[in-house]
């Protein structure tokens, strides 16, 4: 697993034709943020900002996960989404 593979997965995600569910978007987002920035380092958004709060909560779930593990999971999830798209 390398940075190049991670970047290729990021590019592949943008090429998916079908829409992702909100849950899939949050999951991919959370692993991307953990892989690129590490643990969530922003304050909790206000409850009135539902989208930002959901993204924050998704990222917080990965607290303590290494960037490398997050990259691996991100790549695997993108591969799964690509595979499901061809079915």
Curated annotation (Swiss-Prot):
Any one GO biological process: fatty acid metabolic process
Q: Which residue numbers delimit the ACB domain? A: 2-87
Can the keyword Amino-acid biosynthesis be found in this entry's annotation?
Answer: no
Q: Does the keyword Lipid biosynthesis apply?
A: no
Binding residue positions for an acyl-CoA: 29-33, 55, 74
Q: Which SUPFAM superfamilies match?
A: Acyl-CoA binding protein
Keywords, A to Z, come to: Cytoplasm, Lipid-binding, Transport
GO MF, one term, reads:
fatty-acyl-CoA binding
**GO CC terms, sorted:** cytoplasm
Tissue expression notes? Testis.
The record's subcellular location field reads: Cytoplasm
- InterPro entries in the record: Acyl-CoA-binding_prot_CS, Acyl-CoA-binding_protein, Acyl-CoA-binding_sf, FERM/acyl-CoA-bd_prot_sf
Q: What does this protein do?
A: May be involved in the energy metabolism of the mature sperm.
Q: Which family does it belong to?
A: Belongs to the ACBP family.
Q: Which PANTHER family match?
A: ACYL-COA-BINDING PROTEIN, ACBP (PTHR23310), DIAZEPAM-BINDING INHIBITOR-LIKE 5 (PTHR23310:SF13)
State what protein this is by name. Answer: Diazepam-binding inhibitor-like 5
Organism annotation: Rattus norvegicus (Rat)
Q: Which gene encodes it?
A: Dbil5
């Amino acid at each position: 697993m390398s940075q190049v593979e991670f970047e290729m997965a990021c590019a592949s995600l943008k090429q998916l034709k079908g829409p992702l569910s909100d849950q899939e978007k949050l999951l991919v987002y959370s692993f991307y943020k953990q892989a690129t920035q590490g643990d969530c380092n922003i304050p909790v958004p206000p409850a009135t900002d539902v989208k930002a709060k959901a993204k924050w909560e998704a990222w917080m779930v990965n607290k303590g996960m290494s960037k490398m593990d997050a990259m691996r999971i991100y790549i695997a999830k993108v591969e799964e989404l690509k595979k499901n798209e061809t079915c």
